[in-house]
């Protein structure tokens, strides 16, 4: 793994040397280091949205017995095969059979058993006639229509046969998987653990949302945005609060989150006199992997490790922080939780306006995706400043402009990373 690591000379950084790697290279370095966490035993309801860490095989057939798919009458098909409305067949009803009970009687020629949905098929019967095709006459019933032989009977093992693998290790547990687990009698299952993610925002100018907003101060929105992004992934955020621009305060706050599986810092990662995060992390034993990424927004994104713990340093600007999280931290957390699909979907969309940029960095431009007659279109949200949080509120995707591209004209196709897709018909 060490061949992927690129250690940075912090003294050179302080002198102004800037080393940037590509987005793809940064992601490769991160994901080569990230490994799935261990697993834990949870109840099946607690498993919703989690990734299962074991194969599940059926211990028995489902359904375990042939049973009725309809309310109606269990009969011998030979008795009723010629039944019509004009020439109904009259049978003697020998029993009423609710679901959950097994009949001790046998259906003989000329007889029927009234049966409820889910009730086991009684001996002698080979077909169920639905109630709508009958006329009840007390202890007799008239059959007005002959269904096909074997109709309305669910066979034993029709859903699942004993020994079948019904859920595979690595599958995401949705409500339907939980229903299947319940039907198999599994009250508890093993799932991948959810990472604890420590989040620290730094800056003398920051105050919390419930504090007095004095002149020159700003509310630390990143504390909540990042925590929400972590929760949306299914991981567990640990908010360490706000640290002042002093190495001792930053180091003290970071040490409180050392038990976490992942550490995220926001701000204090650029090259400057008041950027103390890198020094505090170095004192905690972090090895730096990279310090700058050739992307916009999000250039001052860092990645390192403290032992086997990944450490991400994000920019302080709200949009830069969110975009960097989407590109690097979200797939990392999903991989740690055992997910097979760790990336947002990327679609082709037709651009509705010209986009210009300087070549050299990959741009992630906030966009609004629409679907018109099965074709995707995208337009920007407007001004793209890295502090304009409202642009992320408007956006449902990120327009990806490659490093070597300087102009994309309206009408051309472009790749767009889908952030929110409920109205687009895109699988996330």
Question: Where do the protein language model's features map onto the residues?
Answer:
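Generic structural signal for well-ordered, non-membrane alpha-helical segments
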Residues: 19-23, 27, 40, 44, ...
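Helix-rich terminal scaffold detector
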Residues: 7-12, 16-19, 23, 187-314, ...
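Solvent-exposed alpha-helices and their adjacent loops that cap or buttress functional pockets
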Residues: 66-68, 83-86, 104-108, 121-123, ...
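Generic secondary-structure signature for well-ordered alpha-helical cores
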Residues: 28-39, 53, 57, 148, ...
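Short, glycine/charged-enriched hinge/interface segments at domain edges or termini
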Residues: 21-23, 73-239, 382, 418-420, ...
